[in-house]
Amino acid sequence: MDFIQIAKDAKDASLKIADISTELKNKALQQIADEIELYKDEIFSANKEDLQNAQSLVDAGEITKSTFNRLKLDENKMRDMVQGIRDIAKLEDPVNKKLLVRELDSDLTLYKVSCPIGVLGIIFEARPDVIAQISSLAIKSANAVILKGGKESINTNKKILSVINSALDKIESFPKNVIQQVFTRDDVAEMLKCDKYINLIIPRGGNKLVKFIKENTKIPVLGHADGICHIFVDESADIDMAIRVVTDAKTQYPSACNAVETLLIHEKFPKIDNLLAALQLSEIQLIDNPESWSHEYGDKILSFKTVKNVDEAIEHINKYGSGHTDCIVTKDTCYLCRQHRMRYQRMTNSYIRLIRCIF
């Protein structure tokens, strides 16, 4: 089937899913979760084939080790994927919510109401669990979606989507073609030109992918190109909390776009050596003089430096960061600590500003 027909089918599906009930959407999501659990061994088998093919690409230097790690599905990721779908089913329906009511004049009232976007084009690299996440969110928000995954995970992607659509086929009155998938670079080129049918493009991947998408389409793009994330350990921080926060932010999923890449430590923090030693025990490679402070490692590698005060930390983050996710570890038990926290929260130029305190 050519891409234009896929896009037309998606547009038709978007109009139909916008008209179904919350109960039907939630029933579909629960069915998807059940089917993924039922067929998880087949999904693992498909993923094993992708991993074998990807290993040869790693050996040849065509993909990185971090890309390989994102590709891998295991029992933990499978469990999280299934639970994530069930959690989305439990969420309040985001559609048809009154967001604003304003009386403009006598007998004239303005209502701002949430509604579906329409057709989403999702382009992603390596991570096959993205299919389940995006499909579930699309269903809950009453949108149709066209997925294009990386070639490294093609077998896993096909299997997961096959399971999802098999589950949807069992739900009476659920519209067809809500979740579709394409596979080639030609399909991507067609997707980027298809502003007649596609309402929003969401790229999920590295810097090169996101920039390419933004530069080659007239369709609105929702994407973030870099994940240069920081943690600032203030002078008052609790050492145990600092160790836990930094270790988890680097090791839980090193290739995630919100994994920490740079650690900033107040020069008056009394246990700098203890913190760095604990990180090394967690097999984190520390770099104190990197070639670039704007490098996304995607691995268990962490650049670090000491700073004189919270203002120097903020200046560093705003200069070298990507505005994604940044965190301060401090206390909230004294006036100075609270001033540092509030200043960090106000002045850091980040979409997500995390505050980790002991009260």
Regions found by a protein language model. Give the residues of each.
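NAD(P)-dependent aldehyde/semialdehyde dehydrogenase
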Residues: 254, 264-359
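Residues at or immediately preceding the N-termini of alpha-helices
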Residues: 3, 22, 128, 239, ...
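ALDH superfamily catalytic-core signature
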Residues: 9, 125-144, 170, 209-301, ...
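N-terminal Rossmann-like NAD(P)+-binding subdomain of aldehyde/semialdehyde dehydrogenases
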Residues: 1-110
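Conserved acidic residues
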Residues: 118, 199, 261, 326, ...
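Rossmann-like NAD(P) dinucleotide-binding subdomain of oxidoreductase/dehydrogenase enzymes
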Residues: 90, 98-240
